[in-house]
Amino acid sequence: MSNYYAALALTLLAGISTGIGSLLALMVNHTNKKFLTFALGFSAGIMLYVSFVEIMPQSGQTLAEEMPKHAAGWITTAAFFGGMLFIWLIDQLVPNFENPHEMSMIGTMNTAPSEEARLHRMGIFTAAAIAIHNFPEGLAVFFSALSNPDLGVVIAATIALHNIPEGMAVAVPIYFATKSRMKAFSYSFLSGLAEPLGAIIGYALLKPFLSPLVFACVLGGVAGIMVYISLDELLPAAEEYGEHHIAISGLILGMGVMAVSLLMLA
């Protein structure tokens, strides 16, 4: 039970980082785009490396203890792509205009009165879109932490870093539309709470069926979710903010840091 609460706490911390993003957006006039580019690339490197080197092998190894090795390989692969399919389907629910991947509006808002209604709508829909996306991210953090608390800390920190610019994407249009810092912060903060909510709902649905076999399949799906987030959200957002080579440098360094961390935890 203590692992459950620790995993939930990590998921909550990852989720509320959207609020940190809103505070940063409201406190500073200009976003350091080079830093954001590097940070998003760094996050992608961590998530890609840990998915392929740690989570996928762990899923396959657990399944191999429950069934023939050949069948375990097929099921691990199916779970991985099933996780990708799951978050892709969620992605299709969000119109492109409100999709949180499209965050180029940060720092470029027009404050003309004629824009206020459009900006308000943009902020609300962006908050809703991020809330939808945070459900599977919450599952990824929660089940990673249940499997390995040390790994859960790394995943939670990575997701938290990823959530900061999403918090900015919610706060900026809401603030320019309403001139209310409290409203901008509230929408951003609440969108992040979908992350622990997704973890609680997912755990409640799966708890009656949890076994080493099911848990291994969930981990395979988590790896797929994390790879999708890296390739569909983090790297494109890093490119959107600016310099390609800075993003790639962050990606490589993220992989290196994750590799050293796993070796030290082994």
Curated annotation (Swiss-Prot):
Main localisation: membrane
GO molecular function (one): metal ion binding
Top-level division of the source organism's lineage: Bacteria
Record keyword Cell inner membrane present: yes
Annotated TM spans: 8-28, 35-55, 70-90, 123-143, 152-172, 185-205, 209-229, 246-266
Residues noted as binding Zn(2+) in the record, renumbered to the chain: 137, 162, 166
UniProt-listed Pfam families: Zip
Function: Mediates zinc uptake. May also transport other divalent cations.
Family statement drawn from the similarity comment of this UniProt entry: Belongs to the ZIP transporter (TC 2.A.5) family. ZupT subfamily.
PANTHER family given in the database record: ZINC TRANSPORTER ZUPT, ZINC/IRON TRANSPORTER
Protein name in the entry: Zinc transporter ZupT
Organism: Chlorobium limicola (strain DSM 245 / NBRC 103803 / 6330)
Lineage: Bacteria, Pseudomonadati, Chlorobiota, Chlorobiia, Chlorobiales
